[in-house]
Amino acid sequence: MNLSQIYNKSPSFISIWKITWPIIIANLTLPIVTATDTAVMGREQSSTFIAAIALGGIVFNIIYFSLNFLRMSTTGLVSQEKGRKNEEEIKKIIRLTLSIAIAIGFLIICSSYPLIEIAKILISGSEQAEHLMSEYIFYRSFASPATLMNMVFLGVFIGIGYAKFAMFQLVSISILNAILSIV
């Protein structure tokens, strides 16, 4: 096989760009949630609320970053099976990764108190900020199953080539979260 044959079989810049631009746009919306939470807490009398959101946010950023393998592995496995045109295997992958996401999500909920104690040891703030951080971690842990399931769905959509739907999903969730934080 010569170079021109390889070039003709490789995806074009345009076909790659069609997949990547929605993902780029979607990821640009993610800071909206933090900015909204900060703005809402900034209206409170004390800066302690902003500190608590920041400290608790660090905890969940680390957790979710560590679990990003759910999206990445789902994307890779689903795209391979899509290339093989194996819908049954795609369904199995979705069931398996959703089961893993739900199990880990409930594990995070059940571990919220030890997680809070570890966070207090590793992240220091004022006594009031740590108390509010504890509440934030406790309540936000209940969103873990849905957050992790969302990672799986994003992986599926990207894996089957529906990057625009993944973008719509992330943008919608970010906007909805911002609206609900304000209300």
Positions of PLM-derived features:
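Alpha-helical transmembrane segments of multi-pass membrane transporters/permeases
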Residues: 156-183
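Hydrophobic/aromatic residues within transmembrane alpha-helices of membrane transport systems
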Residues: 25, 37-41, 53, 78-83, ...
